[in-house]
């Protein structure tokens, strides 16, 4: 996979001996997952490549404010309901901003709720029902 595994050894050392404020829980139950997301002041996904990351939907459903790398994919599927950052320096600045501005963090949390609503089971059901009804109507013509 080339570039996707760059830095593995470096990060493996960190995982083997993490700082006190960082832990790697491994596979967790859905109940524990909700608890962990709810504990987060901010959900950060700095990934360079993604398809459709479920972690974002999980975090949004737990009302965790979301910060992501500025990828074209996110613009399309999340409709701006997150904080986009271009690099680690900008991520750091944004984290410090949110640390000192609870209103901005609250706004980001509300945006997470919008993501959650957009991808809720109820909303997706509405979209699929509309689609199938339209297809059925076309088939009757």
Which residues are covered by each model-predicted region?
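Nucleotide-activated donor-binding/catalytic signature segment of Leloir-type glycosyltransferases, i.e.
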Residues: 11-28
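Short alpha-helical donor nucleotide-sugar binding micro-motif in glycosyltransferases
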Residues: 27, 35-40
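A short hydrophobic beta-strand element within the catalytic core of glycosyltransferases
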Residues: 43-44
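Aromatic "clamp/platform" in nucleotide-sugar-dependent glycosyltransferases that forms part
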Residues: 48
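A short, well-ordered alpha-helix in the C-terminal region of glycosyltransferases
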Residues: 104-118
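C-terminal alpha-helical cap of glycosyltransferases
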Residues: 121-141
């Amino acid at each position: 996979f080339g570039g996707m595994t760059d830095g593995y050894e470096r990060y493996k050392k960190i995982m083997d001996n993490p700082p006190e404020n960082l832990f790697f829980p491994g596979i967790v139950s859905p109940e524990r997952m909700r608890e962990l997301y709810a504990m987060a002041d901010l959900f950060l996904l700095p990934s360079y490549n993604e398809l459709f990351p479920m972690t974002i939907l999980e975090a949004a459903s737990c009302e965790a404010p979301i910060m992501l790398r500025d990828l074209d994919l996110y613009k399309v599927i999340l409709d701006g309901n997150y904080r986009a950052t271009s690099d680690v320096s900008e991520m750091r600045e944004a984290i410090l901003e949110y640390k000192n501005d609870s209103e901005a963090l609250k706004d980001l949390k509300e945006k997470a709720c919008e993501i959650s609503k957009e991808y809720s089971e109820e909303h997706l059901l509405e979209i699929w029902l509309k689609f199938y009804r339209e297809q059925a109507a076309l088939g009757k013509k």
